[in-house]
């Protein structure tokens, strides 16, 4: 085979790949909106509950699967990057609250209401699948810890707001039509050790350092304008 034929074949192969490569790196600009449902988990925490009706130090809490939902409004810049404002609510059921061998509560929940600004790097291609990764920073509008005692006595509720919470995400988007897409991703949010004051049931009391770092999976739909 001559050098000319090899060179010609290489040029033809490279030329045939250029349109696909160019398309893989571009996407249309525009606004999009998303709505999603969420399954979430958080780890166990040991914290202190102060106040006249507080349990004191060494309180151990465990939580079950959380459920939540949310949505975002975003903008694609046409170069693989997007920015979005997200709102999220989730609640995790309390499964155990103990101090040593003593059961303190039989019911309750740990819930949050958060607004975030996310930056997203999308990897568009000629296929229907578009992987993406992102990071964001949120403001906790409210995080609530509700405790319902195992024995007689009123419930106690604690609330906090204003904490910053970073977020990481990784997922994929699937094009159903030119405007509708299915999305699924995993997200890790870190609010850290929360300090919350009593809202009801323990006047002047507080909880110190129950952690709130949920890991979640989202499934939703997205509409592009």
Predicted features and spans:
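Outer-membrane beta-barrel translocator domains and adjoining extracellular loop/strand segments
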Residues: 45-54, 95-102, 143-153, 195-203
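Predominantly the C-terminal beta-signal and adjacent terminal strand-loop region
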Residues: 92, 96, 168, 174-225
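Hydrophobic alpha-helical segments of small multi-pass membrane proteins
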Residues: 115-117, 133-139, 162-172, 187
């Amino acid at each position: 085979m001559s050098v000319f034929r090899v060179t010609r074949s290489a040029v033809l192969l490279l030329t045939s790949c250029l349109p696909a490569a160019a398309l893989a790196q571009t996407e249309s600009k525009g606004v999009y909106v998303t709505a999603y449902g969420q399954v979430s988990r958080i780890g166990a925490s040991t914290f202190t509950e102060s106040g006249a009706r507080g349990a004191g130090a060494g309180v151990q809490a465990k939580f079950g699967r959380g459920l939540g939902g949310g949505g975002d409004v975003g903008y694609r810049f046409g170069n693989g990057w997007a920015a979005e404002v997200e709102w999220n609510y989730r609640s995790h059921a309390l499964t155990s609250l103990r101090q040593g061998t003593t059961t303190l509560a039989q019911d309750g929940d740990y819930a949050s209401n958060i607004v975030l600004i996310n930056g997203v790097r999308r990897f568009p291609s000629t296929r229907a699948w578009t992987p993406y990764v992102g990071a964001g920073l949120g403001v906790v509008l409210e995080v609530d810890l509700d405790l319902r005692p195992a024995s007689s006595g009123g419930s106690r509720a604690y609330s906090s707001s204003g904490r910053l919470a970073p977020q990481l995400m990784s997922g994929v988007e699937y094009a159903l039509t030119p405007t509708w897409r299915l999305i699924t991703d995993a997200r890790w949010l870190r609010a850290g050790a929360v300090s919350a004051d009593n809202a009801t049931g323990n006047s002047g009391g507080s909880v110190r350092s129950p952690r709130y770092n949920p890991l979640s999976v989202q499934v939703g739909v997205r509409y592009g304008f």
